[in-house]
A protein has these predicted regions:
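Conserved FAD-binding subdomain of flavin-dependent enzymes
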Residues: 134-174
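Extreme N-terminal leader/targeting segments of oxidoreductases
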Residues: 4-86, 104-110, 611-655
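A short, Lys/Arg-enriched amphipathic alpha-helix followed by its capping loop at the start of a domain
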Residues: 98-111, 297, 301-303
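Glycine-rich FAD pyrophosphate-binding loop
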Residues: 103-130
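Glycine-rich Rossmann-fold phosphate-binding loop(s) that bind the pyrophosphate
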Residues: 90-93
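Helical element adjacent to the flavin cofactor pocket in flavoenzyme catalytic cores
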Residues: 264-346, 351-352, 364-365, 370-379
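Rossmann-like flavin
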Residues: 161-268, 280-281
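C-terminal segments that line or cap access tunnels to active or ligand-binding sites in enzymes
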Residues: 267-282, 344-346, 351-576, 582-596
Length: 655
């Protein structure tokens, strides 16, 4: 056979073989499709519309709900609760909330609840004290809003310690009705001049598109990514970013995932971002307004507070797929002690801390010192627990780079009337009326420290002299020289921080040093881990509130993981507490879901227009969009869709 004939024969044979394979493949595909069709038909025939099982508990022993039916219901007493004890590590907001839920909804005897606190005072990060050697100290403040569902569920039941017969929520509600919060000057430039941000975000079309893209990105696509990975200068140079990073303390290197969650969580408040009209504040500092009423409620219930008790580890037994907390290791007044546990002993631990390692300065001393992770404390405790099982999280993701997690705040207290006029010129209100003053932070837009300051209702402390004003100041950039004080904020005394603040208030330079020395006292606080929870993360870095397999142990607070909610809020602390108690104790009541504005078409339409400073999304210049826009608008004409688009200013006159 010739070579040509041989090649032809081979080709024919190959073709026949390929045809046979294709025929076989085609037949197999038909069979697969037929099988799928049969399964789909079987599924349809088995389908039944019902709401039975709609609120079945998940693997954590909880379910989420919304609406008044569940919100107003009182759960039955869980079975066997009288035979159980609870050990709560820490006495911050999350821990106290857990104890309150154990008392109110779990109906556990107060004497069975033991709060183990390393310090000699409750409150954790929710502080507010007068230090005779330094002055008034507030490391931070608490911005709240009407859709903190778990927080308000709790505080409706906590009696006021000022007004007999009403709750903390009642007081708070009335206060913010009578004295609503809003700012009259959001930012300044050129030493005290109004920056005239004028309620605008000043985002370009590209910047808006970057935000919208982030908004729609899946969580898993944002694991370990930074904000710099998803935004560029189109966002970073906008007024939106000035508002955002100063209000929430986000830095460019922080988590893109948390940024997205924040945007989704508070989408209903986009319009209130420029003037803080979305926010509500307590009457006093958070210690007096939130912590003390909770502590009294618990003490009245017989809860056992054990101060000067530092928990260093929780030991686990692992058997038959169960993770059982079997012992607590602690130091009581420096003496080592152990607490043996059974499955009937519930343990709740606040893992990590944003205020651990705080270094305090004073009027004449900078807050210098060792800001590294210590051999004790919340971070060490979490590391000891995490070493026992991967499901207990990865603390090192959050506490290993203090250059990226620190900032510094300071409490400035005026001593006379000399600084007051400069404050009044900016915020347009007298700070001594007892009403809203700045209405949120005033950001010094051109400050090298990116300094912001706020004055809440005075007095912030119950025993505060009515002629004194407490100002909270913070700087995002602590390692660069200032504009008046030519050294980094972290190296500055209280007096020097006051001087830098006065410079940005517009005080004449020849008066600054005198006023900083004699007309105010300042207490600076450096917090190495204050934004640790904003560090980029992936799934599993934060442990679940109740890790899989745990039968008597749960995590609380800002470093425990719960779906959809956002850290650095009072709501997050209370939500994790509610979930942990309900899940471990078997409380048969729904946990209020995170407010669902992200799924509300009205909020989405409204926020889109607000973000674009009144421009409609339909005005965005997208190649090819005009071809389909006209037919679509014609299709919806006269329908409820057209009405809602017009109601929320997406469809404007002439469109």
């Amino acid at each position: 056979m010739s070579k040509k004939g041989l090649k032809l024969g081979v080709a024919l044979a190959a073709g026949a073989g390929a045809a046979a394979i294709l025929t076989k493949t085609s037949q197999e595909n038909k069979e697969i499709k037929a099988t799928k069709a049969k399964k789909a038909e079987a599924a349809r025939s088995d389908y039944r519309n019902t709401e039975r099982g709609k609120y079945e508990k998940n693997s954590k022993g909880i379910y989420y709900t919304n609406g008044n039916y569940e919100a107003f219901a009182r759960p039955e007493k869980p079975e066997g609760v009288d035979d159980k004890n609870a050990y709560i590590v820490g006495s911050g907001l999350a821990s106290l909330a857990a104890a309150c839920f154990l008392v109110r909804d779990g109906q556990m005897p107060g004497s069975h609840i033991h709060i183990l606190e390393a310090m000699d005072i409750a409150g954790g990060a929710c502080d507010g004290i007068f230090d005779p050697t330094r002055g008034y100290v507030m490391r931070g403040g608490r911005e709240m809003e009407n859709h903190f569902e778990c927080l308000w569920d709790l505080f409706r039941s906590i009696p006021s310690i000022e007004t007999p017969g009403v709750s903390v929520l009642d007081e708070y509600y009335w206060l913010n009705k009578h004295d609503p919060n809003y700012s009259l000057c959001r930012a300044t430039v050129n030493r005290g001049e109004d920056a005239h941000t004028d309620g605008k975000f000043n985002l370009s079309q590209k910047g808006c598109m970057e935000i919208m893209k982030l908004f729609m990105t899946k969580d898993e696509d944002l694991y370990d990514k930074t904000i710099e990975d998803v935004f560029d200068d189109e966002v970073f140079n906008s007024t939106f970013w000035l508002y955002w990073r100063t209000m929430f303390a986000f830095e460019n290197w922080h988590s893109a995932l948390e940024m997205k969650l924040y945007f989704q969580r508070f989408i209903h408040h986009i319009a209130g971002l420029p003037d803080f009209s979305a926010l509500k504040f307590t009457k006093y500092n958070q210690y007096d307004s939130l912590i003390l009423p909770m502590q009294k409620y618990l003490e009245d219930a017989g809860v056992d507070f054990q101060f000067n008790t530092e928990v260093t580890n929780v030991i686990f037994d692992f058997k038959d797929g169960k993770k059982i907390a079997s012992a607590i290791e602690c130091k009581v007044n420096g003496v080592e002690k152990g607490i043996v546990l059974t499955e009937n002993d519930l343990v709740f631990v606040t893992n990590g801390s944003c205020t651990e390692g705080t270094i305090y300065g004073d009027q004449n001393h900078a807050p210098n010192g060792d800001a590294e992770v210590r051999t004790s404390g919340c971070w060490s405790l979490w590391k000891n627990i995490a070493a026992q099982d991967p499901s207990f999280g990865h603390p090192e993701k959050f506490c290993s780079d203090i250059n990226k997690t620190n900032w510094e705040s300071a409490t400035v207290t005026t001593l006379d009337d000399k600084i007051i006029p400069y404050i009044t010129d900016i915020c347009k209100r007298d700070p001594r009326t007892g009403k809203v003053v700045t209405g949120g932070i005033v950001s010094c837009q051109d400050s090298k420290w990116l300094l912001s300051w706020t004055i809440n209702r005075q007095g912030q402390f119950k025993d505060q002299d009515k002629d004194k004003v407490c100002v909270w100041v913070y700087g995002l950039f602590t390692d660069v020289p200032g504009d008046y004080i030519k050294k980094p904020m972290k190296d500055c005394t209280g007096k020097e921080i006051t001087a830098e603040w006065l410079y940005h208030l517009g005080v004449p330079e020849d008066q600054i040093d005198e006023l900083a020395e004699h007309s105010a006292v300042c207490v600076p606080t450096m917090m190495p881990y204050i934004t640790a929870f904003f560090m980029p993360r992936t799934k599993g870095d934060r442990p679940d509130v109740i890790p899989d397999g745990c039968v008597n142990f749960g995590f609380l607070g800002q470093f425990a993981d719960t779906p959809r909610d956002t850290v650095f809020t009072t709501e997050y602390s209370v939500r994790t507490a509610m979930e942990a108690v309900y899940g471990l104790l078997g409380v048969d009541r729904g946990v209020p879901e995170v407010w669902g504005s992200v799924y509300d078409i009205r909020e989405l339409l409204s926020s889109s227009v607000k973000l674009m400073d009144g421009k409609s999304p339909l005005e965005i210049d997208i190649p090819g969009a005009g071809i389909i826009k006209k037919p679509l608008l014609h299709f919806i004409k006269g329908t409820v869709i057209e009405k809602i688009l017009r109601d929320y200013d997406v469809l404007k006159d002439g469109m």
